[in-house]
Amino acid sequence: MDRSGTAVAILSITTPGFWFGERNEVRKVVRECNEYTAKLRSDHPGRFGSFASIPITDTEGALKEIEYALDTLKADGIGLYSDYGDIWLGDAKLAPVYEELNRLKAVVYVHPIEGNCCRNIVKDVADTVVEYGADTTRTIASLIFSGTTTRYPDTTWIFSHAGGMMPFVIERFVSGTEVEIVPGIVTKGQGSNPPQKVPKGALYELRKMYYDTAQATNPVAMRALRTVVPVSQIVYGTDYWYRSAAETSRGLTTNKVFNDEELRAINRGNAERILPRYRA
C-alpha cells in the first residue's frame, strides 16, 4: 500500500462466497471473516476499512450479522455478490434484508460471481472474462426493474468493474423502464416490469449508484461509463490482488479520459463522500 500510494484499502471477500452449505456453518465462516477484517482495522488504524459479509439468503442470519458487523465491528458497509445461485439481487425474497439496510442508510458493495445459469458455457473462455461483467449487469437490472432501488432509496450501492456491461446496454435499460409517447401511441416498458415500478426511469436510478474502476481503466470502458454517469459516481477500485493498485493508477492516468481534478475525485474525493470517516 505504501509503495503504491494507497492511503486506505476497503476490504471485502471475493469468489466463491458463502451462500452454499449448511446454514450454521455459513454463519460461522461469515462471522470469522468479518472479525478477521475488523482485527486488521484495529491493528492498522486508519489504513483499512471493510464491507462485511452476510449470509443474505438466510434472512435471520443476515439480519443478525448486519447488526453485529455495523454496530459492534464498525464495518463501513455490507459486501454482496451479484447472485446467489439462482437468485439475483432484485429478488423479493431479499426484501427484509433491504428494509434493514435502507433503514440504516447502509453502503452496499457488489462484486460479481458466475451464476448457476452460466458456468463454463464457452469453451476455453474463463467465466471471469465474460460472465462477471454479464452477471453484474443482470443484477443491476434485477435491482432496478424489480423496483428495489426505488423502494429503498437510502441505500448506497457500489458496483465493481465499471458496472459490467451496463454502459453498453443503456439504451435497453432506458427503453425497458420509461414511457415513451409517440404520436397516438404510448409504449410501456419492454419487460414484464411496468414502468411504474421505476417511475423516474432507469437512468435516474443508475446515476444514484457508484461504480469502481477495478479492471476497467481501459479508455473505451471509462468513456462509456462517464457518458452514463457523472464522474462523481466513479470510485477507485483495484481488484487486488488480481490487479495491482499501480496498474489501476497507471490505467487511469494514461487513458486520457479524466482531467486532474476528476482524477482526484475518483482516487479519493468521491469515496470520502461515501465513507466520511476516511477524510484526510
Predicted segment positions?
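Short beta-strand segments
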Residues: 10-12, 53, 159-161, 210-213, ...
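Short catalytic/ligand-binding loop motif for oxyanion handling, primarily in non-cytosolic enzymes
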Residues: 10, 17-22, 59-62, 69, ...
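Mid-to-C-terminal alpha-helical segments outside catalytic/metal-binding sites
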Residues: 1-8, 35-42, 64-68, 76, ...
